[in-house]
């Protein structure tokens, strides 16, 4: 009888992360992962993968390449990033990345009521943020833009 060789793929590598969460054949894994993060606050039933490379309006603008970029069935956008190396300004980078799907929602040259679909940036970090704003005892942090007095988006 032939022995089955076991193979593992590391989610901490760019290849492994994109292979598991960024391919249509594994879409169910991404949906399950997103739903586990939302913990019932929202239910993701389906996603469509989008082009992860974004460039600015002119060639001199900064570009962004997301690990995984997709759209939910209600028009919400999901950016999912795996970051191994420490980056001092990762919060700023995450906010910068979020501007691309926000800007995509603004049609050029037509009337627009400025209604925006939700944009979620999910970052799996293999390092500590080392900031006072984050509880060092927790491994998961939920951060959002909100009205401070009511803690409401």
Sequence positions of predicted segments:
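Elongated, amphipathic alpha-helical interaction scaffolds
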Residues: 1-152
């Amino acid at each position: 009888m032939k022995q089955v060789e076991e193979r593992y793929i590391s989610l901490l590598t760019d290849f492994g992360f994109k292979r598991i969460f960024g391919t249509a054949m594994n879409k169910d894994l991404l949906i399950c992962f997103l739903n586990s993060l939302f913990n019932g606050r929202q239910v993701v039933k389906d996603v469509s993968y989008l082009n992860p490379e974004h460039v600015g309006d002119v060639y001199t603008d900064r570009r962004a390449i997301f690990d995984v970029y997709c759209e939910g069935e209600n028009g919400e956008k999901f950016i999912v990033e795996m970051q191994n190396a420490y980056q001092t300004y990762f919060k700023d980078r995450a906010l910068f990345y979020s501007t691309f799907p926000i800007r995509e929602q603004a049609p050029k040259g037509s009337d627009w009521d400025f209604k925006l679909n939700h944009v979620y940036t999910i970052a799996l970090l293999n390092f500590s943020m080392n900031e006072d704003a984050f509880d060092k005892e927790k491994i998961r942090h939920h951060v959002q833009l909100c009205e401070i007095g009511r803690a409401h988006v």
